[in-house]
Amino acid sequence: GSTLVPQIVHPGPESICGYRGIAPLGPSVNKNANGHVSRPISVEEIQTVVKQYGAAARRVEAAGCGGLGLHTAHAYMLPGSFLSPLRNKRMDEYGGTIDNRARFILEVIRECRKNLSPDFPIFLRVSGSERVEGGNSLQEMLYLAPKFEEAGVSLLEVSGGTQYEALEYILPAHGKQIGMNVYEASEIKKVVNIPVYAVGKINDVRYAADIVERGLVDGVSMGRPLLADPDLPNKAKAGLLDDITPCGSCDGSCVTRSSEKPQCKCHINPLVGKEYDYPELGKPAAKSKKLLVIGAGPGGMYAAMTAAERGHKVTIWEKDSIIGGQLNLAVRSPGKQEMCKWLMHLNYRCKKAGVEMVFNKEA
């Protein structure tokens, strides 16, 4: 099974006013994506929030979780906005210098550590570089990383960018470089004695294994690839790398749905959010049948693959001479070539399952 490590965070400037009438709080006056303006949090309120973090940490351990996650990346939410000079314009002990801007998150870390068992791990996500003029650079993180370790952090997750100015480093889409934050993570690893993980478009197990084996990082964090294939860790452990359904980093339904609608979806994996609706999938069919699928586009191939892997004898008729359907047009657009991985994977899985493909054949 998996270990649950919940990430606790005060939303700060990202608070939604319509939710229980909560007014956004921030280090300074800032406007969030909803147009709501935060008011500067007072020192007394800061001390209250720090205590609340400690109490929440205590509940995390009491609930039997395997660790505690904290977030101070992306100039985002309360800890991240305090740390970033892009958001923090205070003139008191919580603003100005890098030490003052880091004071809040360091107090949070120490308070959480005080409320946890000595060996209960604390994970901290940071931006290795905010990659924006006037934001925190790698040099600031190299200075702060040992301080985070000293305060009680057990593992650093290195992301990058900011929520508003450099989102592409947080959720790198197709067409963007794989492992965009690995360099920053590898540099931070040199100045601490705790594990350092890289975050951000690490959607290939072979690549992940390579950067770990070369000692660039101690591990990786994945999100979107586990939606495309929830069995990715098990398949990787078993050496079934070709069987892993590839994430195309399309940032489609997984990102937009999680922000706008309650149900997350995936363009690659149609079962995301519907796993309990189709309990028979993944299990052998009660009786093998002969099935004909019309069209070797992504939908037809996925249907054929699913049926064949359950034990049915499946044939695909495709009117053209190649697989792919409309996806062959889509991948011609700039930056969309990564979607070819999905098509190649479907072809591999169909062949492995024994699907017969007949080309230049109309129904």
Positions of PLM-derived features:
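Beta1-alpha1 glycine-rich phosphate/pyrophosphate-binding loop at the start
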Residues: 293-360
